[in-house]
Structure formats: structure tokens, C-alpha cells
């Protein structure tokens, strides 16, 4: 928890007392993708440093947002994971991420930090089409060196790091730019397949089309005046 406080009864201020320290929300962002070992959190957030990461994790534990756990066999390694209270941050933080999509990029933003799994994480907040809550499936994506999967549980998609632990309905491979264009509806699944920018390793074209029909970002409608003032981040999502 932050050592400084706004000292206000306002629930937004009290939330920031817990979440307002630099890096805290990004640590939570990584845990939204599933349980993580300390070294994997450090690799995902290289600029945070070992001591600061340990401090932020202690703060999240003290606040009841994250906890230590051990992965089941055969892994049986210590990890950090979100608690039920931590999971309650999923919707508000992903809504914040979607809001951030419309912020202009500047020279301080490193395009090399774009990650497909974080794009997918943001995409899960765009689901508007209902899906049968009885379906339990996974969809695996291999985007460059990044491997992640989308779980379909209780009618909702969740993005998770790494390969699917169960046999996926769909496994596809593509590059980061292609995935970005699919996510932003700048490219259709059928066109990506036609242009050989996507390879289906397992599954069907129908499954691929479904993912990007149910999950895809549509920019907000702007008036002519607003469009002139707003500068879209060129090239796609930077999560």
C-alpha cells in the first residue's frame, strides 16, 4: 500500500491510496494474465528492479489483492496470484486500458514494448456478443515469440499467458502487426488467411473468425471537431 495518502473518504481517493504507487497497476496487469513467478514478473517489467517489485508485491499482499501460492504438479513452483478482491479489479483496469487506446503516442513510448498477450488482455474487455455459457474452450495464439491463449469460461473470454493447458479448439500463428490489425478491425480473418498472414495450425477458419468477431476494438465515434483534435496512436494498440 502507498505510504502517502490523500486522506479523503472518497472511494476513488481510497483506491488510489492502495493502487497509486508507480508500477503497482502494471504488476496487477501481469497477474490478470494468470499466476506468475517472481522472475517472470521481473522479466515482464524489467525497469522495475528486484527491490521495488518485492515491495509492490508485499503491498498487494497487505492490501489483500495478491497472495503467494504454489502451482499444482508437475510444476509445484511458488507464484503470485490475484485474490478474489484482486480479480474485482479486472473490469475497471481493462476499461482503463481501452480508454488509453485513444491517447496519442509520443517519443517516450517505445514501440518495442508492444506485446500480443497484453493486446489480447485488452481485447477481452471488448466482448459485446453473448457466447453460450456452457462452452469451455481455449484458443491458442503464437505471435512471434509470444505464446498465450484465450479461455472461454461461463460465456466470457479470459487472456492467459503461455500455451493452453488443455487441447485448444484453435491454434494459430502470425506476427505482431497482423494480430494488431485483426484486433483493431483493420484486417479481417478471411483476408489475413487469404494473404497468408495467419497460419492455422489446428482448428478451423470459423473458429478464427469467431474470435475476432466477438473480440475486436471499435474506436469511439467522434464529431468532426473531436476527430481533428484527437490523434490516434499510429500503428495499433500499445498495451
Tell me what each language-model feature is.
Residues 20, 72-95:
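Basic, amphipathic "hinge/linker" alpha-helix immediately C-terminal to the N-terminal HTH DNA-binding motif
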Residues 165-239:
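C-terminal interaction segments
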Residues 53-63:
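Basic amphipathic alpha-helical segments that dock to polyanions
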